[in-house]
């Protein structure tokens, strides 16, 4: 199989999601290691959506790795609704999958997920999420004492939030003409109440505001309380209109996340209100048309490029299913943690570099993916943490 670009992932992958994903579960067999009777390893993927901008890329790259490694996967969309996050774990385990990767919403959902995997001897890892020891000590302790919870791959969300505030408040001569001046009245659109990742990003936004205000006592910036848009474009549009109707002096909007659809709605609503290129918009999760949005002022800056995060979660589960010693969970040890780096862009020029090395061509060739699957945890962690535009340039020179 040749190397596949992100642009061609979707056509290549033949994705299975939602009801179709559940229908294919009967093909799973064998627990806690290689498939029974010599069958393939089967790994379940529980994700909020396999069709929005980030969700699609996430499932596509797992599918690419699975095909290279001869693994069967089944994808279930759960919409970040708590009962829909936990129920598919039971279904995947009952069908006999060897491992599961999950993007949950709240830490509390991991209690049922871990217990179910413990009972069924199925390996479990998170992606885009990490159980908080501080906020969820009981859930953290449960994971710590599990022999099947492998760990988590996630991002430095506090640092992400701080960096986006730094970009929003700074002047930028390379930005679209109408939004070159730093923002001071920033509105915050969140997605799901209680989402663990949002809570960390919010800490970063608030920290970034505090740092700016401490350094600029005569030029203060403000950040609104969050208003929640869930994961739909229509609710994103409604929240954006609500912000502007309430305070038309706003000069920036952070769409904190939600997979991409809320951002699509917010950007579209600003266009409908003739505010494109007049209000800075920042977000996390790259849109398919980000280059055009940067060029026209629809977007000011964005963090993203982290769609390889679920790839590494998948590789950890795969390694555990294969019996690789450095990935095997041990009771009393919380598990493995990989902290994935973000890519930040705030100009067309910056995005063009990202596009060349992450979009037009995949950041990993087939041979490189095969090599990643042979690494021990420390080496795999190093590979993940070093992923950047410069890293891909070096490897693919």
Feature locations, PLM:
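N-terminal export signals
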Residues: 2, 8-28
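Bacterial lipoprotein signal-peptidase II cleavage site
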Residues: 28-36
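Hinge/cleft segment of the Venus flytrap/periplasmic-binding protein
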Residues: 39, 184, 189-193, 313-397
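Extracytoplasmic "Venus flytrap"
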Residues: 41-61, 65, 74-86, 103-107, ...
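Short, solvent-exposed amphipathic alpha-helices that sit
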Residues: 54-68, 160-164, 196-216, 265
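Hydrophobic alpha-helical segments within soluble ligand-binding/sensing domains
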Residues: 85, 145, 150-183, 236-237, ...
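Hydrophobic alpha-helical
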Residues: 100-119, 205, 225-292
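Flexible loop/hinge segments that line or gate small-molecule binding clefts
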Residues: 114-159, 179, 290-291
